[in-house]
Amino acid sequence: YYEEIGSTNDEAFRLGVQGAPEGTALIAESQSAGKGRLQRTWHSPPGANIYTSVILRPRFEPDLAPRISLAAGVAVAETLDPYCPGKVSLKWPNDVQIGGKKVCGILTQMKTATGVIDFVVVGIGVNVNWNLKEFPEDIQKMATSLSVEAGREVSRLELIILLYENLAKCYRELSQNGFAPLRKKWLDRTTMIGKPVSVTFGKETISGE
């Protein structure tokens, strides 16, 4: 537990390199350098949200590692469901939304050794009791918090316990039963099916549905 840290993912990665065991979890009250995908900043004010990273050491091939991020998305969605039934959805590849607005981001980082996974860090940031007026202007129209959508303040302790339980359950299911069961859960929640999408590889952009 950290009152303040640069980034829980950075610290978890450092601990992973040092040999920290699977299941090691870090949580912080605030981050001064929270990280999102594509080198974006994850806004991390103190005392309102959840910022956590978990170290996993899966026993499957590196090219299957992206499944961990999708499993984490399912775990987060199942955690938020009791607070906003029927409103939680998943947007490829790492966003959890409530009512079409982002409430959680997931960032996974992997270290490999001789063609196998050494460890994976799963970073999760959830907007919990963040007032919309406090959101940075550039994300106010696209982001929300659990308390705003639920209409009440949410116990972060209760939420983080439930999150860790669901994350452990989904990771165990992925490890023991493969991706198929989680894939169905993810597809049942995704907002992307049938929607126009564009994917950019360097200078090439591919569009489709």
What positions do the PLM features span?
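Short loop/edge segments at beta-strand edges and connector loops
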Residues: 3, 90-92
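Conserved active-site carboxylates
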Residues: 95
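Long, positively charged amphipathic alpha-helical accessory segments at protein N-termini or as interdomain linkers
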Residues: 70-88, 98-209
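N-terminal lobe of the biotin/lipoate ligase/transferase fold
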Residues: 1-82, 102-104, 154
